[in-house]
Amino acid sequence: MCSTNPGKWVTFDDDPAVQSSQKSKNFPLENQGVCRPNGLKLNLPGLREFPSGSSSTSSTPLSSPIVDFYFSPGPPSNSPLSTPTKDFPGFPGIPKAGTHVLYPIPESSSDSPLAISGGESSLLPTRPTCLSHALLPSDHSCTHPTPKVGLPDEVNPQQAESLGFQSDDLPQFQYFREDCAFSSPFWKDEGSDSHFTLDPPGSKKMFSSRNKEMPIDQKSLNKCSLNYICEKLEHLQSAENQDSLRSLSMHCLCAEENASSFVPHTLFRSQPKSGWSFMLRIPEKKNMMSSRQWGPIFLKVLPGGILQMYYEQGLEKPFKEIQLDPYCRLSEPKVENFSVAGKIHTVKIEHVSYTEKRKYHSKTEVVHEPDIEQMLKLGSTSYHDFLDFLTTVEEELMKLPAVSKPKKNYEEQEISLEIVDNFWGKVTKEGKFVESAVITQIYCLCFVNGNLECFLTLNDLELPKRDESYYEKDSEKKGIDILDYHFHKCVNVQEFEQSRIIKFVPLDACRFELMRFKTLYNGDNLPFSLKSVVVVQGAYVELQAFVNMASLAQRSSYAGSLRSCDNIRIHFPVPSQWIKALWTMNLQRQKSLKAKMNRRACLGSLQELESEPVIQVTVGSAKYESAYQAVVWKIDRLPDKNSSLDHPHCLSYKLELGSDQEIPSDWYPFATVQFSVPDTCASRTEVRSLGVESDVQPQKHVQQRACYNIQVEIEKKWIKIDGEDPDKIGDCITQ
């Protein structure tokens, strides 16, 4: 009747040998409405037994429990929680022979081991029910009526509100009461008269007037009473499910927020935050005489580029504070080993200075080489927090004021520009764009003598309106419409607003972000398309992804010749319930299943179903990476040099889960695609003119690069099997 519980929980088992009990002739008047035991016997593992002449496991049928409302605050003396022996009343405080003692459950407090927390929720008994319905939001939840449950007398309303107790959330205790073979007069329903259930369903019997006049606190004074135990179990279960519902709702909200905010709507994407829990590499600089390790810290980034590090969150004073300057930069992010089966995202904060050197090769040349000094090395196991930190620091570096330093005299003057287009887009499962944006960042590195002013003009549509000399005669070249822009503090903003010419006094030997602006996507087709489908059949899940390169006919005239896509990363999020199915165990360590290029996984190939999860790819490699909590498909270059342009590439991984309950209905339905295309711009940005106000012009270098970040919706298909409830699949489509 009751689910199996840990070793020290009270369980009731049906005894087929016990027949229906006979009605006692000496019952008090107020006890005639109490339910019969229905042949239950008590299993109390781990509890002490006192020696006695009679046994509590006798096969003699139990009579109906005798309840004394005034003198028996504990369980009924003839209930399954108290085996009847003789009519000897016993001594107060001493248990009767042949009975089991129920020890009190300690009060829930902050220093108690039974304090309500999410980590101890596994110790609580649960009713055997469908978890996918019990933990879903309101639109997917079951429609069974839930009885109201009152708060215990020991918990005041303020404490109950702080603990998150709610009266309409948990029907578990009601099921326990309905299935139980006996009834306690202390079970009550708030908002209605006190009653308890009889054997015939739907019939109710009221308490006597003596019980109604009973003091309220009398029902919970004795910690050994059945009422006390039931209330404690009820509210421990309430806290567990309340935390589960709260965590599920937060997860759903985070998923919706991530899905809605993937495409940035402003130039600055960082949001105000109190800080992040990070790891600091200690000691900060490498030492040949000592080893380095990770130490947990709490990190804050204040306006003005101030980094504050605390030993833990909530402290008033940081143990270290660093002021960033324009010569600081972030290194390339990496993923490193952190534990036996875990990874950590790492980044270095570096201080960079340049020196001019003369090199002697086949011909003499002058180069400017960077001198890099590591300031900090930080890491985080949360990919979302890691990206948020990188975005915040990068934006704070752009907002820093220019630093006045003595100018150097260079033998070879040089100006370098790097134009980086960041494309953001969301694609439906049909392959259509629903939202897109392009944010362009222009980085500048100058080695110029004196305090000369530099100028830069772009193919801005507003520029010919201000000066006709910049009118473009070539009709094939199109201009860009700058919707929003932000400049570094070294730029003369008033001059740009008047003439649309960017004039600035550059920082000496410093790579800084000169400008960022936003434009609309021109609507050109992407270099390749991604189609993802997940098929669910019971506890069997199969995901397939297909990559198709765009043909020359589909490419725009602006794209010109076919350019390669580099460093392709496709992330397929994996629910936490599936992680154990994507790992293999051996004697040394825990490994993630990995698939390299498999030519047999082409379209139309026949593969036998295997009992273990299989990941197959036709190009590149794929594996589950715990750092991203996703299956990551890595491709170095597309189109592949070993295949034709129109040949599709595919990924497939199959999972056989332990149960169909491991398929969450709130699975994040998007795959993330990241890649870069060199020597191109998604915004069609071009440099019209670049130089200094001098007769001697420096060497000029312009580089372009487009970085794509795309969310592709994963199509869900559900194959119905016999006996499966179609309502539990949520938004899945029947195939």
Swiss-Prot record:
Its main location: cytoplasm. One of its GO terms (biological process) is focal adhesion disassembly. InterPro entries: Adaptor_comp_med_subunit, AP2_Mu_C_sf, MHD, SHD_dom, Stonin. GO terms for molecular function: clathrin adaptor activity. It is found in: Cytoplasm; Membrane. Keywords: Cytoplasm, Endocytosis, Membrane. Residues 412-715 form the MHD domain. It holds the Pfam family Adap_comp_sub. Residues 275-408 form the SHD domain. Ubiquitous. CDD domains: AP_stonin-1_MHD. Residues 1-35 are annotated as: Disordered. GO terms for cellular component: AP-2 adaptor complex; cell leading edge; cell projection; synaptic vesicle. Belongs to the Stoned B family. In contrast to other members of the family, it does not contain NPF (Asn-Pro-Phe) sites and thereby does not interact with EPS15, EPS15R and ITSN1. May be involved in the endocytic machinery. This is Stonin-1. It comes from Homo sapiens (Human). The gene is STON1.
